[in-house]
Amino acid sequence: MSELVYHIPVLLDESVNGLNIKSSGVYVDVTFGGGGHSKEILSRLNGKGHLFSFDQDADAEKNIEASEGFTFVRSNFRYLKNWMRYYGIEKIDGLLADLGVSSHHFDDESRGFSFRFDAPLDMRMNKRAGKTAADVVNEYDETKLADIFYLYGEMKNSRKIASMLVKARQKKTIQTTLDFITAVRGQQIPTNTMAESREKKDMAKLFQALRIEVNHEMEALKEMLQSATELLKPGGRLSVITYHSLEDRMVKNVMKTGNAEGKRVQDFYGKVETPYRLVNSKVIVASADEQKKNPRSRSAKLRIAEKI
């Protein structure tokens, strides 16, 4: 498996160590990407156990190398439970998820994930299905757009941005990343380095919001985490790397309470019930050395929990 053209795996040793791998166990990497984490897991199975790796992006298949005890599943990880049933797997020993968007996606101009390039406003992980980001910005009403930017981009001025988009699309269909940037920027051009930096951060949040909506990322994450909780054996490990507060909050909630909303369920005696024991009470972040070598690791947070 070669991650050279895709991305450098983040928190590689920390996340795989967190699985506490048994050489004969069954493991799942729900975010194959460049194959870096999968390759490390396979090296610790020594041909005795089995690894299932998921990725819905056809480009990820280019990184597959035939390996004993390895199965690649081209699918969204929200269908984890269905695929495990298909392969006759009732329980698993561990699951790893690196929820970051691969560098490959940001660097591929044709995918429309980055505001660095003028490209079709697509943003679909699976290019075969679903609405594009252009469909979202041209078809959703103003209220729905504002909600997306507020919930998924955490933009305080989401209503103003939505209003600007609606006015812009009345004059011209928004088809490219540059069309989108021009529409939400309006007439205001950064006048200094600080303003330019602030605008880049805002653009990153807006693009994040669109990407999450287009790919139904939060719904998919919720379903995957629910399936993982059902599939993990007692003593099985869940190792998840997050990159923004929305997904980190959901992962934290599931690990602490067993549900995505963070609702505490109590037994008859008032004791809070949870299916997990936290392995690390505080999030694990990349070392200064890793952050220097791989800047995308700066926002990464690793949480590990063990099924009770």
Describe each PLM feature range.
Residues 1-308:
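S-adenosyl-L-methionine-dependent methyltransferase catalytic core, i.e., the SAM/SAH-binding region
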